[in-house]
Amino acid sequence: MKVYKFGGASVKNADGVRNLKHIIDGENELFVIVSAMGKTTNALEEVFDHYRTGNIEAAQAKIDEIAAYHQAIIDDLFGEHRTLGQVEALLSELQRFITTVPYDASRAEERYDRTVAFGELISTTIISEWLNFAGIANHWVDMRRTFVTQFRHKDANVFIEESTPLLRREVAGSAERVFVGQGFIGSAADGSTTTLGREGSDYSAAVVAHILDAESMTVWKDVDGILNADPKIFPEAEKIDALNYVDTIELAYSGAQIIHPKTIKPLQNKNIPLYVRPFGNKEAAGTRIDGNAEDVKIPIIILKRNQSLLTLRSRDLSFVLEEKFPIVFSILERFRIKTNLIHNSAVDLNLCTESSWRLEEAAAAGVKISLNIRGICCWVPGTVRGRASTRIVSIVDRYLEHARIFHFGNGGEPLVYIASADWMRRNLDRRVELM
């Protein structure tokens, strides 16, 4: 058995689906994991945001856009005016959920997972039907019935031991020897849909490979293999022919957009090689990852965006000692704030984290939040976004010493302004503003 994984970019249109068929032609004993098509997960996140804020009309309009996008792919593949009953049923189920199930802030992450999972369910349904139509008999697998996960939404881990008999039974009971399943999703013990984290389809494929004792796993991407830098930023980036498991884990953890960080462990445990190959060139070797490759000899450059620096200091200026670390990290774990870099001095503990503060989720859970903000705050207590348990004090004064920096998203074209500051370095160096 081989395992192939195709990301959303590789199946974003009908030509991509046809190319998937071209790649798997001639393969027997193959398990294909597929992500949502194109930017469907982003679109479903918009649906959820509208649902969360009570704008059901906007949510329905976005669902209509998603339906039209997939119908255009279906028309291109099968011929105009062809409908797929399973796809229509999934879209109707999504519509009913958004319009009839009231939003519950205490179950926000569960509702999020249930919403975004429709992307993978729809994409695999279309692809499975198309492969059957094109002469490749296959068995569609609902991964929610075969992956048992933690009761943890948005970033669950798969319980491999509990999932193994379920997936093996599904495979053994099928006459077809090509299987199509969803990446990114599973279910908790209570049957609720869970997701494995954004870009978690790599991890899904690795778990499948582990359970089925696959001879190899291949991720088909829009690059020639793993490069030593992002070619969109560094045009001179070079392809790496071979990597070992340890280097790959370190690169993924450090932010290299090559593979999901949780992918390697299930493969390493059974010494299953991983290939990263270009979906535009079936014959290209790409990059091989296994336990035998030598250390990489060329420099690797990783640019990680949207990072935040937290500086923690005790009020009495007591030393930062190791016994205080568990308190800090238990809070970070509680709200799933991922830490990428740690540095401590005598009285400060500095943490570099992903810019995902999760204040709304914490407030919705009843956590009392007190913010002292130097400047203007747009988070309003007592609204959908700002709960009554939140207390905000904004300090505005013409004689405040620090620089004030204002960042506006501006529809994807950010604008940054600096105000009320002179150009003395003390006003700019080592300042972290919370807006």
What residue spans do the PLM features occupy?
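Structural motif
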Residues: 1-2, 29-32, 71, 137-139, ...
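Short helix/loop capping segments that flank catalytic or ligand/cofactor-binding pockets
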Residues: 42, 189-190, 228-229, 275-277, ...
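PLD/PLD-like phosphodiesterase catalytic module centered on the HKD motif
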Residues: 362, 367-435
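Short, glycine-/Ser/Thr-/acidic-enriched flexible segments
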Residues: 8-9, 37-38, 185-186, 201, ...
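A conserved active-site cap/scaffold subdomain adjacent to cofactor or substrate pockets
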Residues: 244-290, 295-316, 321
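Nucleotide/pyrophosphate-binding catalytic subdomain
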Residues: 1-259, 264
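A conserved regulatory-domain signal marking ACT and ACT-like small-molecule sensing domains
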Residues: 287-370, 376
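Flexible, glycine/charged-enriched surface loops at secondary-structure junctions
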Residues: 82-83, 259-262, 273-282, 335-347, ...
